[in-house]
Swiss-Prot record:
Example of a GO cellular component annotation carried by this entry: ribosome
Name of the protein in question: Large ribosomal subunit protein eL43z
Keywords for the protein's UniProt record, in alphabetical order: Metal-binding, Ribonucleoprotein, Ribosomal protein, Zinc, Zinc-finger
Superkingdom as given in the UniProt entry: Eukaryota
Organism: Oryza sativa subsp. japonica
SUPFAM superfamilies to which the protein is assigned, alphabetical: Zn-binding ribosomal proteins
Family assignment from sequence similarity: Belongs to the eukaryotic ribosomal protein eL43 family.
Start-end of C4-type zinc fingers: 39-60
Entry-linked NCBIfam families: eL43_euk_arch, PRK03976.1
Length: 92
């Protein structure tokens, strides 16, 4: 395992290099890209990052395109909610 501390976490490997504010930004990205996400197809927390923007479920094998560091980008969430709202308006 690489170097880490309780406070620095995953960016402990960088030591004192690059500055505190940059390490905080990197920590946010690295924690989100290494975490598991919920699979919409099988309903399990098994989606992991395969490459930049490619997310795959370890359980059902489905592959989904998403953001570089998180599975869902902010703009994708906005578009999805807008489409759902418009669909509900046309049905009602």
């Amino acid at each position: 395992m690489t170097k880490r501390t309780k406070k620095a976490g995953i960016v402990g490997k960088y030591g004192t290099r690059y500055g505190a504010s940059l390490r905080k930004q990197i920590k946010k990205m690295e924690v989100s890209q290494h975490s598991k996400y919920f699979c919409e197809f099988c309903g399990k927390f098994a989606v992991k990052r395969k490459a930049v923007g490619i997310w795959g479920c370890k359980d059902c094998g489905k592959v989904k395109a998403g953001g570089a560091y998180t599975m869902n980008t902010a703009s994708a969430v906005t578009v999805r909610s807008t489409i759902r709202r418009l669909r509900e308006q046309t049905e009602a």
